[in-house]
């Protein structure tokens, strides 16, 4: 069995897909935010690796093929935006202000947290790209001297939390405007948040897709500036 895992180029991909399918089944059955498919799949994969003492390198021989699809999948998010382009043109100033303020708030929150908890410089820059998609965040972290593997974990946690609590936050804050919901999810919770935005509606999904791209670009620029503040 272990020899098959070590020599298989598809074991990692297979176990990842099965784990995600389990997450989807649980979400449909219980309809609760805690049963997020991505969160469930992460727990399942980690559990399998620990129980059967499978080395991460062996798992990643197949798992990396799913990672390769991350960038093209992000690019495909332009499709819903194109379908709602008329809304973007009509609300351009509000959209730009929303994404800019959301990105700035995210960077400021990390700076405040770093000072509050006494992070060193490497820990600080590792956290800076927390709200942007993994494909961009890994590059930002590496460029600034952060720990890329931890950056990836932080990005995933941020996205999952955003996905889980978005509807609760919107309900408490009485936010009902679809454009605002989409921008909030895309700016703060990247692609994972966008998955939730698409569940909420086509306008939310389109605005969230736009927010991912613009917030990513702003964070690349802003992170370089904020990195020098600690």
Could you tell me what each predicted segment is?
Residues 2-16, 20-82, 87-98, 102:
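Helical membrane-embedded segments and adjacent short helical loop/helix-boundary regions
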Residues 12-25, 42, 46, 50, ...:
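Transmembrane alpha-helical segments of multi-pass membrane transport proteins and ion-pumping complexes
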Residues 27-31, 53, 146, 170-175, ...:
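Generic secondary-structure signature for well-ordered alpha-helical cores
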Residues 30-34, 55-56, 60, 86-87, ...:
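Membrane-interfacial segments
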Residues 40, 98, 154, 210-211:
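Hydrophobic core positions of alpha-helical segments in small-molecule transporters
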Residues 57, 106, 122, 163, ...:
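Short, electropositive, low-hydrophobicity segments enriched in small/polar residues
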Residues 81-160:
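Internal active-site segments that recognize and position negatively charged phosphoryl groups
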Residues 123-150, 156-158, 172, 176-214:
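Alpha-helical membrane segments and immediately flanking helix-loop junctions
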């Amino acid at each position: 069995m272990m020899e098959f895992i070590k020599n298989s180029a598809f074991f990692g991909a297979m176990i990842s897909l099965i784990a995600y399918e389990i997450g989807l089944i649980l979400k449909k059955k219980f309809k609760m935010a805690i049963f997020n498919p991505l969160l469930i799949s992460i727990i399942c994969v980690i559990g399998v690796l620990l129980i059967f003492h499978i080395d991460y390198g062996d798992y990643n021989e197949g798992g990396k093929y799913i990672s390769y699809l991350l960038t093209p999948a992000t690019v495909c998010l332009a499709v819903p935006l194109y379908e709602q382009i008329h809304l973007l043109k009509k609300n351009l100033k509000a959209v730009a202000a929303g994404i800019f303020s959301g990105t700035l708030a995210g960077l400021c929150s990390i700076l405040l947290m770093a000072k509050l908890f006494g992070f060193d410089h490497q820990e600080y820059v590792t956290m800076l790209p927390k709200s942007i998609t993994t494909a961009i965040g890994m590059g930002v972290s590496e460029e600034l001297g952060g720990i890329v593997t931890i950056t990836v974990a932080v990005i995933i946690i941020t996205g999952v939390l955003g996905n889980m609590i978005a509807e609760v936050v919107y309900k408490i804050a009485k936010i009902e405007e679809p454009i605002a919901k989409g921008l909030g999810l895309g700016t703060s919770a990247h692609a994972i948040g966008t998955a939730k935005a698409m569940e909420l509606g086509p306008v939310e999904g389109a605005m969230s897709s736009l927010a991912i791209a613009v917030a990513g670009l702003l964070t690349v620029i802003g992170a370089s500036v904020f990195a020098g503040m600690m």
